[in-house]
A protein has these predicted regions:
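Conserved beta-strand-loop-alpha-helix hinge in the C-terminal portion
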Residues: 226-251
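Non-catalytic connector elements of ABC transporters
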Residues: 255-257
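ABC family nucleotide-binding domain
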Residues: 7-222
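Pre-NBD coupling/linker segments of ABC/ABC-like ATPases
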Residues: 2-3
């Protein structure tokens, strides 16, 4: 079975069924989806919609019960656990709600961590260069030696994003990445994602918040394991503009008598 080679993601009639006792739970029901390089897609849905199950399959953390999933032209639907682990490390960068940083390790060393498990055995000097570049991409080029307890929540999430980028993945997969952040810091982090996407980095973001999804370019909504909406984002939000307006408002308050 062939697939378009220019697609980052192609899902074809994906089903996922969990067997719990005498009851079969159909978490994902016949989902088909195509994502091109450089897209910025939000996957939305309420609890029980199937979005988390779909994310796990896109992230090669789980396999579909039936259907096919191609990542960068590779059919990963039937790969064994070891092969899936290689695919995850090489082609997918993960950003989670929790930062999951090593407390006694610098920002640079945290970002270098995925390179230690890269089967290509990247030389140490290149690991250092890649990690430094990743931190520069997320605006932390001057914080490479800082430990997590020396960084704000937003800065820690930037380190986590840098870590996700260091293997130069085909796909950045973010699961509720602003869930632990205050509103202003959330806007700043969405600004980081928007700037990365401007550099043609493909991003899929799983969220239940419409305000977060509006920073993306395309919104896919699930209900009862099926896609019910797949359309371009209307009235898209732009983090840089919102931050500028917020700073102006804060300055006006300071200047008020």
């Amino acid at each position: 079975m062939s697939v378009q080679t220019n697609l980052v993601i192609k899902l074809e009639e994906i089903h996922k069924t969990y067997h719990t006792g005498e009851v079969d739970v159909h978490a994902v029901r016949g989902v088909s989806l195509e994502i091109l390089p450089g897209e910025f897609v939000a996957i939305m849905g309420s609890s029980g919609s199937g979005k988390s199950t779909l994310m796990n399959m896109i992230g090669a953390l789980d396999r579909p019960t039936s259907g096919h999933y191609w990542l960068d032209g590779i059919d990963v639907s039937t790969l064994d656990r070891d092969a899936l682990a290689d695919i995850r490390n090489e082609k997918i960068g993960f950003v989670f709600q929790g930062f999951n940083l090593l407390a006694r390790t610098s920002a640079l060393e945290n970002v270098e961590m995925p390179l230690l498990y890269n089967h290509k055995r990247i030389p140490s000097h290149e690991q250092h260069e890649r990690a430094t570049h990743s931190l520069e991409l997320v605006g932390l080029g001057q914080r490479t030696d800082h430990h997590p307890n020396q960084l704000s929540g937003g800065q820690q999430q930037r380190v986590a994003i840098g870590r996700a980028l260091v293997n130069r993945p085909s796909l950045l997969l973010a699961d509720e990445p602003t869930g632990n952040l205050d509103s202003q810091t959330s806007i700043e982090i969405m600004g980081v994602f928007q700037k990365l996407n401007e550099q043609n980095i493909t991003i899929i973001m799983v969220t239940h918040e419409l305000d977060v999804a509006r920073y993306t370019k395309r919104m896919v909504v699930l209900r009862d394991g099926k896609i019910i909406t797949d359309e371009a984002v209307q009235n898209r939000s732009f983090a840089e503009k919102e931050l500028q307006q917020l700073r102006q408002a804060q300055q006006a308050v300071k200047l008020a008598p």
